[in-house]
């Protein structure tokens, strides 16, 4: 594999003309087989590989030999034989060749994505960007609108073939891909003319198609956004005196040379931040409402012209960050931009400058969180804790661990908020729901359960968390940290409530 990558880096045309012979090389499949046995792949685990009962490298090897002999009995694209046994064999061959085709196509795709991403200033477009807003305190104070876009699932197979043809000139390798795509489209599970690509389905071929499609979209969209919105020169904070800022900018423009107008005018360009996870992409913009309306208008047009795909306008939602709540992965973001007046006095006391800036104040959105807890049967819609009857068959340690994991994720995410009343309420709901679940399991009362467990009902609380964050701090520094907003930026796992949040989003769409 290292040799493949080295050849692909030295000669860009090499990766476009060698694919078709690889379909008949047993060594490549053996390389991937050893690769998964060693456990060196981060995107696929051996458990997932073994869970697919229809795939076998030995079957692929035998199938390659039959293809070399031009045995037409294994043509898996036809559905003319009514014999169910033959249909099962065709389906078996089809799934095997499908996996082998995916393995071969991933080689040039990984090479191309690796070096093109390096040229995009570390924009990681090949995989989904797992971002749950810990970076917002540094980035989003300069943004006031959010565009929430859902990437459509339905894609015509010919569009996927054309996107592959943009960077693969090996025509023979595209023919089996086109046949497989049309076979998948005509399967009994899919009655539409388009392919329904669902990244939540644990299929290697679908995940590869989804990543390739989104990568092709972002490789064009992200550089356009960066060139259009990213400031190219001085930052907005370079001018300490921001009183009548627009008037001063106009005065500077009249006196500066023509070649410096663009660099100065770029100070007024809006800032933009792009985040994607799975089928949702979030674009944060600093600008006016008119600019947001233009973005909502141009994003569907961009998909329509570049990918020949009609994207419904309702899939692009816009809302103001200070008035509405944004959500991703089961986490909710709501901020409050408070005006902060800073008075600057010069050393010679000639004049005093007033600086008016916005202070980033994250808020714990208690109502959406209670809605997710109610959907998970941890409380009712009014926030009253109830017992989780589905968990009564588990052991006491498993019940405590599940409630503790939910609480730790919520606390780690929302601990940056200065207002802790919402967090205390969520902790009360979870602790009482845990006590009711244990009491229902042992046919006891909540008082007995709380008396037996005591402080172990939840292992983490606010004071222990702060000691964990600042173990080397003095007591004075620890007391000061209680007043500061500290974001826990290392959250290794997804919020357990994300599945419920995804179901709510699917119902809305």
Swiss-Prot record:
GO molecular function, one term: RNA binding
One BP annotation, GO: RNA splicing
UniProt entry keywords in alphabetical sequence: Chloroplast, mRNA processing, Plastid, RNA-binding, tRNA processing
Top-level taxon in the UniProt lineage: Eukaryota
One Pfam family here: MatK_N
A Gene Ontology cellular-component term: chloroplast
Localisation: Plastid, Chloroplast
This protein's record includes keyword Iron: no
Family to which this protein belongs: Belongs to the intron maturase 2 family. MatK subfamily.
Role of this protein: Usually encoded in the trnK tRNA gene intron. Probably assists in splicing its own and other chloroplast group II introns.
Protein name as catalogued: Maturase K
Lineage: Eukaryota, Viridiplantae, Streptophyta, Embryophyta, Tracheophyta
């Amino acid at each position: 594999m290292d040799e493949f990558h080295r050849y692909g880096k030295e000669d860009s045309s090499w990766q476009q003309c060698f694919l078709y012979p690889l379909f008949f090389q047993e060594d490549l499949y053996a390389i991937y087989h050893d690769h998964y046995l060693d456990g060196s792949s981060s995107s696929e685990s051996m458990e997932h590989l073994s869970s697919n009962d229809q795939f076998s490298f030995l079957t692929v090897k035998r199938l390659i030999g039959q293809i070399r002999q031009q045995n037409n009995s294994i043509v898996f694209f036809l559905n003319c034989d009514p014999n169910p046994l033959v249909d099962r064999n065709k389906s078996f061959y089809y799934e095997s060749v499908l996996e082998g085709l995916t393995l071969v196509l991933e080689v040039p795709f990984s090479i191309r994505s690796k070096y093109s991403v390096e040229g995009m200033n570390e924009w990681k477009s090949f995989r989904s960007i797992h971002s749950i807003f810990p970076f917002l305190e540094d980035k989003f104070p300069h943004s006031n609108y959010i565009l929430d876009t859902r990437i459509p699932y339905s894609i015509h197979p010919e569009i996927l073939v054309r996107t592959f043809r943009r960077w693969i000139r090996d025509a023979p390798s595209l023919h089996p891909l086109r046949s497989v795509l049309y076979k998948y489209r005509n399967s009994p599970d899919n009655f539409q003319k388009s392919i329904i690509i669902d990244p939540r389905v644990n299929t290697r071929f679908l995940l590869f198609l989804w990543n390739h499609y989104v990568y092709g979209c972002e490789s064009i969209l992200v550089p356009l956004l960066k060139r259009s919105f990213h400031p190219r020169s001085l930052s907005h904070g370079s001018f300490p005196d921001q009183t009548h800022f627009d008037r001063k900018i106009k005065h500077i423009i009249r006196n500066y040379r023509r070649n410096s107008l663009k660099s100065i005018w770029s100070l007024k360009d809006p800032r933009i931040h792009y985040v994607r996870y799975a089928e949702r992409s979030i674009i944060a913009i600093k600008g006016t409402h008119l600019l947001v309306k233009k973005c909502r208008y141009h994003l569907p047009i961009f998909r329509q012209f570049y990918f020949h795909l009609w994207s419904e306008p309702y899939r692009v939602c816009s809302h103001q960050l200070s008035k509405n709540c944004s959500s991703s992965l089961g986490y909710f973001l709501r901020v409050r931009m408070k005006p902060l007046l800073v008075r600057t006095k010069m050393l010679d006391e000639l004049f005093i400058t007033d600086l008016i800036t916005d202070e980033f104040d994250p808020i714990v959105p208690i109502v959406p969180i209670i809605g997710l807890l109610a959907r998970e049967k941890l409380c009712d819609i009014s926030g009253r804790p109830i017992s989780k009857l589905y968990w009564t068959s588990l052991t006491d340690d498993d019940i405590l661990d599940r409630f503790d994991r939910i609480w730790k994720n919520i606390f780690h995410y929302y601990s940056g908020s200065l207002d802790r009343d919402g967090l205390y309420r969520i902790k009360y709901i979870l602790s009482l729901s845990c006590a009711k679940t244990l009491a229902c399991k042992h046919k006891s009362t909540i008082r007995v359960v709380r008396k037996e467990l005591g402080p172990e009902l939840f292992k983490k609380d606010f004071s222990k968390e702060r000691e964990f964050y600042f173990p080397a701090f003095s007591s004075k520094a620890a007391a000061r940290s209680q007043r500061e907003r500290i974001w826990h930026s290392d959250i290794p796992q997804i919020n357990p409530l994300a599945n419920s949040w995804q179901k709510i989003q699917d119902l809305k769409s």
